[in-house]
Amino acid sequence: MSIDVNWRFATSGPDGEALAERIRSFIHDRFQQVALPRFIRSVQVHAFDFGTIPPELEIKDFCEPFADFYEEDDDDHTSDASEERGEEHSSRWNSTHPELNEPSYREDTAVNHSLRDPFPDGFPTSPLRSPLGEHLNPHFLPRASTPGIPGGTSTLGYHLMSLGGLSGTQTPLAAVAGGNPFASGWSDSGMGPGNRGRSETHAGMQHPRAEPEIDTSNSTSRPSTANTLPSHPSGSSKNSGQAATGRNDHPSLHAGEHLEDSVTQGQLPLPPRMRERRPEDFQVLCHVKYAGDVRLSLTAEILLDYPMPSFVGLPLKLNVTGITFDGVAVIAYIRKRVHFCFLSAEDADALIGPEQQQQRESAGDDHRPQSRPDSSASASQKRHGGLLQEIRVESEIGRKEDGKQVLKNVGKVERFVLAQVRRIFEEELVYPSFWTFLI
């Protein structure tokens, strides 16, 4: 099934201009996180335009949305979860002690007595929700100071969450949710139904423990969001969770006997909260071909080392005038959210088959006999390489001699910028990363 896209209507007007500005700002922010080579001082992104040539879309399949699209953000639902737990605790208290819910008793209790604890003394609590003992090293839960966030951000929720996290554009962080008692990721196993409400309320009322300030900004280059954001698991990134847990290299973690016992005896982290599947949820797989005139304007400042290192910087203007793209897009509609991403070559071959198989199926619709190719030809028809097959670019700096730039590093700058554009696209828009639009 092929569909026509009103490209001009979708990319023009106030909404189209706002979307183009958001894309420009996003690419610009990503370039600020890239470790630049010695001969480039900075890269600025000035403009983005969708162009006038629309892509070619061919619908391949309607199916159920990927499970990753149903994951909820812990920071968005922390307040809801706490309210639900509070209501559950209140209803349990009222059901077990109905005589204490009378108005006369409540007034007498409020005036003359303190509120009794519904659980007997000595009731065992979960060791994981109790205050940290002296046997745990305080460096086990570091809290690095972060500008703009009082007290810093705790990395506990980030390292203890499941392998499925947030991607690229999800661009919102869920790691900061680890600072509250309900998003710590500890399991409630071993706790009774009554003790769960008590321990959570007790943990929420505790005063924060003093923790040492550890400076983690000792990296020589700015990390990209691929190294700071947890990614969704897929067939090609099953080890992403292991890599994430090893990114916080603090030398203060001691492998003592008490620490090992605490880790080994603790339960595994809870799985991510999942939204409920509904019959109206659907997902579309589309084969996208694009050879258009999308434009991206950048400026890279080149450093000149003569007569001394980093003597002066010259701006090099780079204009991306078009790209050639061939890949499989995924569009999922879940409630009032639209999730969008592309599939890698391996995932696309696994879901909809290699390109040669698609060509045979499309040719078979004409009821013409097709010759069966050999296995070597079939292997050569598999998708390979990146999704961006070609990026056309024009550079402007100073004068030219015989159609060539005078400066020697212009070619290096062009290759570096184009490689970063390709990397940003593949890291932020290729599954398991995806973008979410609220409609």
UniProtKB/Swiss-Prot annotation:
InterPro entries with a match to the protein in the record: Mdm12, MMM1_dom, SMP_LBD
A cellular-component GO term for this protein: endoplasmic reticulum membrane
Locations listed in the record: Mitochondrion outer membrane; Endoplasmic reticulum membrane
Keywords, ordered alphabetically: Endoplasmic reticulum, Lipid transport, Lipid-binding, Membrane, Mitochondrion, Mitochondrion outer membrane, Transport
Domain of life from the UniProt record: Eukaryota
Stretches assigned to the SMP-LTD domain: 1-439
Its membrane topology: Peripheral membrane protein
Disulfide bonds: none
Main localisation: mitochondrion
Biased composition (Polar residues): 215-245
Molecular functions (GO terms): lipid binding
Region (Disordered): 70-103, 185-274, 354-386
Record-level GO BP terms: mitochondrial genome maintenance; mitochondrion-endoplasmic reticulum membrane tethering; phospholipid transport; protein insertion into mitochondrial outer membrane
Residue ranges, compositional bias (Basic and acidic residues): 78-91, 247-261, 362-371
Domain statement: The SMP-LTD domain is a barrel-like domain that can bind various types of glycerophospholipids in its interior and mediate their transfer between two adjacent bilayers.
Function, in words: Component of the ERMES/MDM complex, which serves as a molecular tether to connect the endoplasmic reticulum (ER) and mitochondria. Components of this complex are involved in the control of mitochondrial shape and protein biogenesis, and function in nonvesicular lipid trafficking between the ER and mitochondria. Mdm12 is required for the interaction of the ER-resident membrane protein mmm1 and the outer mitochondrial membrane-resident beta-barrel protein mdm10.
Subunit structure: Component of the ER-mitochondria encounter structure (ERMES) or MDM complex, composed of mmm1, mdm10, mdm12 and mdm34. A mmm1 homodimer associates with one molecule of mdm12 on each side in a pairwise head-to-tail manner, and the SMP-LTD domains of mmm1 and mdm12 generate a continuous hydrophobic tunnel for phospholipid trafficking.
Name of the protein described by the UniProt record: Mitochondrial distribution and morphology protein 12
Taxonomic lineage: Eukaryota, Fungi, Dikarya, Ascomycota, Pezizomycotina
Gene encoding the protein: mdm12
